[in-house]
Amino acid sequence: MKKPCCPNTECPGRHAAEKRTVAPHGFYKTRSGRRRRYRCCECKTTFCSTRGTAYYRLQYRRELFDEVANLSVEGVNKSAISRVKGIAWNTVHRWLERAGECCRGFNDKNLVGYELSELQADEIRTFVGGKQDVVWIFAGIEVGTRLWPSTVVGRRSYQNTLGLFRDMFNRSESIENPLIVTDGFEFYGRAVSEVIGKECLYAQVIKTRRNNRVVKVEVRREIGSKDEFEKALLESEDSETLNTSFIERLNLTLRQATSYLTRRTTCHARRKEQLEKQLEIVRCYYNFHRAHRALKFGMETRTPAMQAGLANCRLTFREIFLWLVSLMQYFRFGHSTVIGIGLRPSFA
């Protein structure tokens, strides 16, 4: 790896690739050995190679940090991780908070520029602190690529519904008449009309349940004619009828991957911020690392980000947690560094 760039944003030689602006400046000790420090020859700032990443001032091996993050997205709670890995609970909590912040920045920077042709949205009910403090997790999925582009945590209100659709459409490339399907929640129709107007096909699928079984399915075409919906379904590679099956399957994936969403346990989040950060880790893992079985082409199994053209290979947590270092090197040395970790250069 090339030497890192100076993290000082006001340094005059920060992006000067032709000059030797960074020099080795000794080592510092950690529990897993010693780490290299650097010194900027222009502004005299001293720093380590992990400055600004999830590994900054980490006293343990990076592999252990990655293992904790991997366990957290497989439905393992913090107490179980602490017992299995022999790490203090507070350390596990602090690491996951740090990983969540890193994944949030990674998602905000790289989940942009995808095509939005068929969209489904839904919400999950859970609670934070106590059962009386109910919150809802709004999520959307791009059906063709299985990409999970956006999520909002909060009350089941019009503002949060509007925020979900605004975020998904602001991140996407413009496309004519996307097919949007949701359930019968009252604010979905208003939010779709506010964000995209009549330039889409929007339908609601309303399921009536009795004794926990679906006894009736009603389809309402809110925006668009019957012929337009039939044409859109013929062009779709995944949907034969109007449905919410894909977003409901994503909801199941979230409940399996997030210990905070497991029913009838004591693993609920104590604060809303904890739930949001854990969901950012899961979203990053789902989009960029975990191969999706529905995206198998021959011997190749792709991630949703690969299918959407946002990455050219599966990313590991190591590459995701070090993405800021690669980003700084991109500005200094060019495209090759970012391509090396599998991200599309135009979004790095």
Predicted features along the sequence, with ranges:
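Residue-level recognition of single "structural anchor" positions
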Residues: 1-348
